[in-house]
């Protein structure tokens, strides 16, 4: 599982900055963690967030402008047998897309196993087989994705940046006239 690891998030729900992650990594070096003893009175409590998937789905859908419709749009969603296996299909289907889902049967060992953004071939083939207009393949922890068009052609991060830049330019939002990726 070399492509996956632990992610820490701050109280705002976003990933920690690199400096904070570096400090945490230093604590995890052999011999360091064992020497740290926490005062039981200072340790917080963990609790289960009821309906976390539902709440996250609502948040993700709120990021899509209401004017953007997915009704009847045929998509392939490859969840890499990982973190996106429940949420991604739910979000796209609730937005109205007609989805075909692959990589949504994690067993604890098959994450990224010849599937997902690091192995987009199955997504590309499925797009062609079902006649989808596009496909999205996430990596195991769902912090990256790669896309393909209706012909199975890969749309990578540079392509996405170019598409976003052209959109921003058309709306007068690209202030400097350039994008650095």
Feature map (PLM): residue ranges:
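Gly/Ser/Thr-enriched, mixed-charge loops and adjacent short helices
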Residues: 2-130
């Amino acid at each position: 599982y070399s492509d996956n690891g632990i992610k820490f998030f701050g109280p705002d729900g976003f990933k920690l900055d690199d400096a904070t992650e570096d400090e945490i990594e230093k604590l995890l070096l052999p011999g360091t963690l064992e020497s740290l003893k926490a005062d039981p009175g200072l340790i917080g409590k963990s609790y289960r967030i009821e309906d976390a998937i539902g709440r996250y789905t609502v948040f993700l859908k709120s990021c899509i402008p209401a004017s953007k419709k997915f009704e009847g749009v045929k998509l392939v969603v490859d969840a890499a047998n990982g973190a996106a296996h429940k949420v991604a299909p739910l979000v796209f289907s609730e937005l109205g897309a007609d989805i075909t889902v692959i990589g949504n049967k994690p067993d604890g060992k098959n994450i990224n196993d010849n599937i997902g953004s690091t192995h987009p071939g199955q997504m590309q083939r499925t797009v062609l087989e079902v006649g989808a207009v596009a496909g999205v393949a996430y990596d195991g922890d769902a912090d990256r994705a790669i896309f393909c068009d209706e012909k199975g052609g890969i749309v990578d991060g540079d392509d996405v940046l170019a598409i976003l830049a052209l959109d921003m330019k058309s709306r007068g939002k690209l202030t400097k006239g350039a994008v650095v990726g």
